[in-house]
Amino acid sequence: MRKSVIAGNWKMHMTCADTKKYLEEFLPLIEEIPNDRKIVIAPPFTAISTFSNYTNFDYLNIASQNIHWEDKGAFTAEISPNMLIEHKVKYAIVGHSEPRKYFSESDEQINKRAVFAQSSGLTPIVCVGETLEQRERGEADRVITRQVEQGLENTDPSNLIVAYEPIWAIGTGKTCEASDANKICALIRSLIGFSDVIIQYGGSVKPNNIDEIMSMSDIDGVLVGGSSLDPISFSRIANFE
């Protein structure tokens, strides 16, 4: 049976002091979550060490917001798996729509990050998703197929999370209909060819829509942005019914 993975991506938010305060409020709220799910948070790199000092790893794990495909070298602004594992990081987000957009990350680069994350002992959370223009032109399935086939080449599906994040729904307040998201997640599962691969939905996930999203047959979790910054909101999402 697939475990649900509820992940929060803090993006460029939260200082070390903010992180300490957040966790002091958040951890008691998730102490009794069911054992059919995992909770993951991706803080900014500067807060990872603070985060690791205040986290109970029985029910909450750390993710990085990106990862490089080399252990070390002249790669300014990048971070390696070894640097992260030292601070108890277990997951790594790769291919998020923001690096794709702002830094022109290609499917090939995303694939290199994902493959190296796995070989280093981390579980990659690989993001895929279409723009509004692509969706309106009826190209969503084609775009997702390309991103999955190229971005996940040579990865191990048993140590993989794929996050479907329609770009037009990220931070906009617009949510993809749960049934539509479920169809795309089913497509992703069929493309990977491994029924137990964990597939998340991301895009304006909030306390008032989490229960419907998580009721879908092919959605195994969520990748949450803004709502993960509030410990009350994120605890409600983590404790979905």
Curated annotation (Swiss-Prot):
Top-level enzyme category: isomerase
EC number: 5.3.1.1
Any one of the GO BP annotations: glycerol catabolic process
Subcellular location: Cytoplasm
Active site (UniProt): H96 (electrophile), E165 (proton acceptor)
Catalyses which reaction(s): D-glyceraldehyde 3-phosphate = dihydroxyacetone phosphate
Main location: cytoplasm
This protein's pathway: Carbohydrate biosynthesis; gluconeogenesis; Carbohydrate degradation; glycolysis; D-glyceraldehyde 3-phosphate from glycerone phosphate: step 1/1
Cited InterPro entries: Aldolase_TIM, TIM_sf, TrioseP_Isoase_bac/euk, Triosephosphate_isomerase, Triosephosphate_isomerase_AS
Pfam families on file: TIM
Cellular component, GO, one term: cytosol
Disulfide topology: none
Record-linked PANTHER family: TRIOSEPHOSPHATE ISOMERASE
Protein name: Triosephosphate isomerase
Source organism per UniProt: Prochlorococcus marinus subsp. pastoris (strain CCMP1986 / NIES-2087 / MED4)
Gene responsible for this protein: tpiA
